[in-house]
Regions:
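Short amphipathic alpha-helical segment that frequently serves as the phosphate-/nucleotide-binding helix
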Residues: 16-20
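Conserved, mostly hydrophobic/aromatic
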Residues: 6, 26, 102, 146, ...
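Hydrophobic "anchor" residues on beta-strands that sit immediately upstream
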Residues: 2, 34, 77, 142, ...
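Histidine-centered catalytic micro-motifs
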Residues: 2-13, 36-39, 144-149
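Short, conserved active-site loops that position catalytic residues or coordinate cofactors/metal ions
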Residues: 34-47
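Catalytic domains of carbohydrate-active enzymes, especially glycoside hydrolases
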Residues: 22-37
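Extended substrate/RNA-proximal surfaces in nucleic-acid metabolism proteins
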Residues: 49-175
Length: 179
């Protein structure tokens, strides 16, 4: 079965086009299941990285409307992609209840103000891994997107990276969360 579970919309600021255009393109490509999982809004604004709270209702209504409109042509699912922040656990719990599925895409970590794309030392890598472990062990996501984003800035493919990667895979397997 051809499926795409990580489709963003213009609301996140780094995708473009109308929601319905994604549905039509998926149908043309033979996709059978199309999951929309735009970057979730959180209390702190991240323009260009995630939708704003003011867009959440429109997102839900649009995707659910398309799900109904195209129900005989493609299976459409309403999801969300989240980052884990200690101070926004309520939001994650809300999304877990309100969406069909939740993807963990840990772009930011609360370690020296870094994004996951800027991890350059073992401590940052460990902190990134712990975020993933926390979310998986508490049942707050259904899958993990791009678990390797730390490789963007980590200076070398060393034993620490290999160990952290193996540990992330073990965490995902332990909690039955696909990568």
């Amino acid at each position: 079965m051809k499926a795409n579970w990580n489709t963003h919309t213009f609301r996140c600021g780094h995708a473009s086009g109308a929601d319905e255009d994604y549905v039509k393109a998926a149908i043309r490509a033979g996709i059978e299941k199309l999951g929309f999982s735009d970057n979730a809004p959180f209390r702190e604004s991240f323009p260009g990285q995630r939708m704003d709270y003011s867009q959440l209702q429109d997102y839900r209504e649009s995707i659910l409307g398309l799900k109904k409109k195209y129900k005989n042509e493609i299976s459409i699912h309403l999801g969300i992609e989240v980052d884990h922040y200690d101070n926004q656990l309520e939001d994650m719990i809300y999304y877990r209840k309100e969406m069909e599925y939740v993807i963990l895409g840990q772009h930011q970590i609360e370690y020296q103000g870094m994004s996951s794309y800027e991890i350059f030392d073992e401590n940052g890598l460990g902190y990134y891994r712990e975020h993933i472990a926390y979310v998986c062990s508490n049942g707050l996501c259904d899958m993990i997107a791009h678990p390797d984003v730390f490789l963007w800035a980590y200076p070398k493919l060393d034993g620490t990276v290999k160990q952290a990667s193996a540990q992330i895979a073990e965490i995902a397997a332990k909690y039955n969360v696909p990568l």
